[in-house]
């Protein structure tokens, strides 16, 4: 049935075309010129074209009716008995933009050729100019000096190699050739070793200490010999740095000199409080956590003003950090307020065998107002190794004074107490009995002639004088003023387990001391 409908549709179309041809012939005869008639056969007026297209558009298969057969001769029409209706005998029909042959209606896709997919070849021209495509560009950075001097291909490694280290020069280059030429020119002029190229994955930028970051030479890459096992890509970093490493005398002297010579230029993350004998650090926001840790271990910190994320104190002892976090969350309403850590500390004491005494701290936590830094002044540093014990006694006396002043404060909350550290904050309520006992226990354990790890008569007599002023009593057996001064320090070997003796500090005999304290 579908084929019959298609044939009937073709028949209707041909009849319309035939009527159009007849109209053209009549028009040509009326003009009286056969030549003009031939030309007019190839011209179609817009009016006639619109008539044909409108007729085709409104035509539907339901309107098709059978045409009666024509048997009379002489009429200008096709003979239905002749085989002139075959597709090969039909003329092409213009049905749109494409010239369609009637036979195409019987072919697949109505005779419209479908283009085949062409195979890709290397000669295909790109759709756009390749010069407009942006390719990734690698910059090269030359760190001329410092503990991590070299040529880097990553800005993150370069920043880590230069951040926090004063006096380091670096520059960016577009190519490795320019970077190498600049590095060689610098090393030649300075008569130093040739700088190495350090790829991104091979940079070792974590020095052991802040002091070593400024003084130690760059380390060469370690070559590990493995048999049947894969070399680890990097050493697993610990979650946090423990406080186990002991500070050495060289580290302390370096930090002491740094504080005395610091004038505030080039670093706005810290300032110093300068006294006659010692300069203490005051760390502000964005201070180097590694330096804060080492200054804390050296007993050279007066105040810390940390950020809200407490990144400056992340390397301090864990119990101290936890006490600060609990203060922010439990003791103040607005946790976004700035806080401070005010520290009173002793300094370390060394002997020939090593570290004898670690610093002891009393830390006060509170809400900070606007920080007004004092002017840091470059002070003259004349301290010698033999003067360290005298400086330790001076800081020990100040530590005892700060600890005894807690007796005058009636509203104190103890945040944390350990063998060598007491952390407290102000409270709106009176001190509870539990916190008062914790303070008294800490005072009895710490305040003695052995505060610095060895028996020091100067500390004993200072405690006695201070307690007497407050109305208490402090008794020390076998320790009098006559033995508190050493006239010939060179001839005195000092106590067996104490530091090297200095003038007017340590007695000649290591006498055990028993003490008792009563404070009204």
UniProtKB/Swiss-Prot annotation:
Pfam families per UniProt: Cauli_VI
Compartments, as annotated in UniProt: Host cytoplasm
Keyword annotations: Host cytoplasm, Translation regulation
Annotated region described as Disordered, given as residue ranges: 486-520
Swiss-Prot/TrEMBL GO biological process terms: regulation of translation
Gene Ontology annotations for the cellular component aspect, listed alphabetically: host cell cytoplasm
Family indicated by similarity: Belongs to the caulimoviridae viroplasmin family.
Miscellaneous section: The inclusion bodies are the site of viral DNA synthesis, virion assembly and accumulation in the infected cell.
Role description: Enhances the ribosomal termination-reinitiation event leading to the translation of major open reading frames on the polycistronic viral RNAs.
Record-given protein name: Transactivator/viroplasmin protein
Species of provenance: Cauliflower mosaic virus (strain BBC) (CaMV)
């Amino acid at each position: 049935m579908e084929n019959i409908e298609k044939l009937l549709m073709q028949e209707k179309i041909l009849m319309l075309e035939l009527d159009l041809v007849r109209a053209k012939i009549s028009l040509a005869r009326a003009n009286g010129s056969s030549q003009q008639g031939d030309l007019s056969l190839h011209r179609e007026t817009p009016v006639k074209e619109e008539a044909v297209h409108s007729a085709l558009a409104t035509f539907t298969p339901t309107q098709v009716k059978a045409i009666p057969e024509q048997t009379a001769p002489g009429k200008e029409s096709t003979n239905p008995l002749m085989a002139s209706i075959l597709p090969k005998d039909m003329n092409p029909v213009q049905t749109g933009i494409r010239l369609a042959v009637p036979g195409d209606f019987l072919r697949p896709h109505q005779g419209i050729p479908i283009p085949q997919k062409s195979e890709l070849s290397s000669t295909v021209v790109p759709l756009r100019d390749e010069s407009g495509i942006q390719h990734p560009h690698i910059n090269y950075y030359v760190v001329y000096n410092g503990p991590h001097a070299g040529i880097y291909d990553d800005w993150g490694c370069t920043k880590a190699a230069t951040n926090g280290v004063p006096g380091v020069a670096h520059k960016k280059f577009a190519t490795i050739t320019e970077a190498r030429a600049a590095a060689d020119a610098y090393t030649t002029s300075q008569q130093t070793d040739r700088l190495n190229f350090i790829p991104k994955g091979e940079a070792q930028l974590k020095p052991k200490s802040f002091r070593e970051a400024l003084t130690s030479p760059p380390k060469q890459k370690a070559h590990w010999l493995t048999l049947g096992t894969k070399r680890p890509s990097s050493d697993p970093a610990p979650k946090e740095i423990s406080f186990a490493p002991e500070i050495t005398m060289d580290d302390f002297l370096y930090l002491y000199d740094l504080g005395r010579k610091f004038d505030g230029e080039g670093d706005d993350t810290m300032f110093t409080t300068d006294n006659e004998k010692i300069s203490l650090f005051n760390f502000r926001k964005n201070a180097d956590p590694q330096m804060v840790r080492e200054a804390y271990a050296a007993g050279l910190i007066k105040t810390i003003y940390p950020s809200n994320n407490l990144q400056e104190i992340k390397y301090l002892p864990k119990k101290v950090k936890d006490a600060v976090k609990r203060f922010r969350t439990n003791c103040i309403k607005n946790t976004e307020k700035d806080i401070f850590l005010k520290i009173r500390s002793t300094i370390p004491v060394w002997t020939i065998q090593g570290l004898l005494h670690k610093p002891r701290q009393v830390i006060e936590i509170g809400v900070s107002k606007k920080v007004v830094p004092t002017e840091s002044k470059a002070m003259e540093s004349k301290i010698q190794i033999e003067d360290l014990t005298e400086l330790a006694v001076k800081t020990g006396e100040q530590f005892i004074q700060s600890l005894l002043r807690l007796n005058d404060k009636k509203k104190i909350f103890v945040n944390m107490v350990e063998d060598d550290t007491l952390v407290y904050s102000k409270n709106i309520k009176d001190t509870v009995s539990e916190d008062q006992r914790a303070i008294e226990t800490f005072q009895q354990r710490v305040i003695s002639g052995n505060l610095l790890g060895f028996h020091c008569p100067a500390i004993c007599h200072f405690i006695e004088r201070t307690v007497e002023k407050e109305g208490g009593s402090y008794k020390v057996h076998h320790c009098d003023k006559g033995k508190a001064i050493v006239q010939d320090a060179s001839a005195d070997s000092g106590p067996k387990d104490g530091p090297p003796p200095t003038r007017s500090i340590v007695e000649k005999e290591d006498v055990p001391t028993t003490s008792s304290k009563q404070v009204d």
